Regions:
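Mid-to-C-terminal secondary-structure elements
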Residues: 119-133, 145-238
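Membrane-interface anchoring determinants
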Residues: 8-10, 44-45, 74, 165
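Membrane-proximal extracellular/periplasmic loop immediately following the first transmembrane helix
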Residues: 35-102, 203, 212-222, 226, ...
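Structural preference for long, well-ordered alpha-helical segments in enzyme cores
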Residues: 7, 26, 38, 78, ...
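Short acidic/polar micro-motifs at solvent-exposed secondary-structure junctions
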Residues: 60-71, 94-122, 132-145, 169-171, ...
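Short, membrane-interfacial amphipathic segments enriched in basic
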Residues: 1-5
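Short, strongly hydrophobic transmembrane alpha-helices
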Residues: 6, 12-43, 53
Length: 238
């Protein structure tokens, strides 16, 4: 019992020191958990898409002043050319423009700053993003937009957004034709709330489409099987 008494007294007299040690240990464990969680988050970046092992982004590698440069900017027709060249390996392709950052959109007199991008009818199926409402073929028509679930809550509250009109920069009316699931935080497209039909880009001359210039597009390819990737590596002539 004396031993227990002395141990008890020691703990009582040094309780402040023990408390600091416990707090320090707790903080250390918490920080470790946060670090591990962040590492896991980064290692799982862009794995949020359905069957992400089959999803690829097209990279452009070119030589400029004897320096090799890599870019995800491609010419508009590149994705379709790959699909035509490898019909047995490619399930679908999509082409986007991603430079509509922090664009002003208006519902009546209310302004909403949103990140937007263009997309074609294969946008959602190629990326593996769930479509909550609407027909993706609507993206073949100009002046059409699909909006995220989060934007529906922000702009329309309890109203049905389908058929409603939003104005881009207060000037260009766009009709809401669909709703898609929010891009998660570990996605390169996180924060994108509006997908504008690529047909709108053609109508309003937002970018050149051709093989002799206009590399402001980002292209994605979804393969039928992940192991087909090595067969579709496209190399530019040296």
């Amino acid at each position: 019992m004396k031993s227990l008494y002395y141990v008890t007294q020691t703990l009582l007299h040094s309780r402040s020191s023990n408390l600091i040690k416990i707090i320090s240990l707790t903080l250390g464990v918490t920080v470790s958990i946060l670090i591990f969680a962040r590492q896991a988050f980064e290692l799982n970046y862009d794995t949020c898409y359905e069957d992400y092992e089959r999803l690829y982004i097209i990279k452009n590698i070119y030589s400029l002043n004897e320096k090799i440069t890599e870019s995800h900017n491609t010419y508009g027709p590149v994705a379709a050319a790959i699909a035509d060249a490898f019909p047995e390996e490619v399930e679908s392709v999509t082409v986007t423009q991603q430079w509509f950052a922090n664009t002003g959109w208006y519902k009546d007199d209310s302004r909403f700053a949103c990140n937007a991008m263009t997309g074609d009818s294969c946008f959602f199926s190629t990326l593996g993003i769930r479509l909550l409402a609407g027909n993706p073929n609507e993206l073949t028509n100009p002046d059409v937009i699909f909006i995220s679930r989060d934007m529906v809550r922000e702009v329309f509250a309890d109203q049905n957004p389908i058929g409603q009109t939003l104005k881009m920069n207060r000037e260009l009316p766009m009709t809401v034709k669909g709703v898609f699931e929010d891009f998660p935080e570990n996605s390169s497209l996180y924060g994108t709330q509006i997908v504008i039909s690529l047909a709108s880009s053609f109508k309003h001359d937002w970018g050149y489409w051709g093989w002799d210039g206009g590399d402001g597009y980002t292209s994605f390819v979804r393969l039928r099987h992940a192991e087909d990737a090595e067969r579709i590596i496209v190399r530019s002539p040296e």
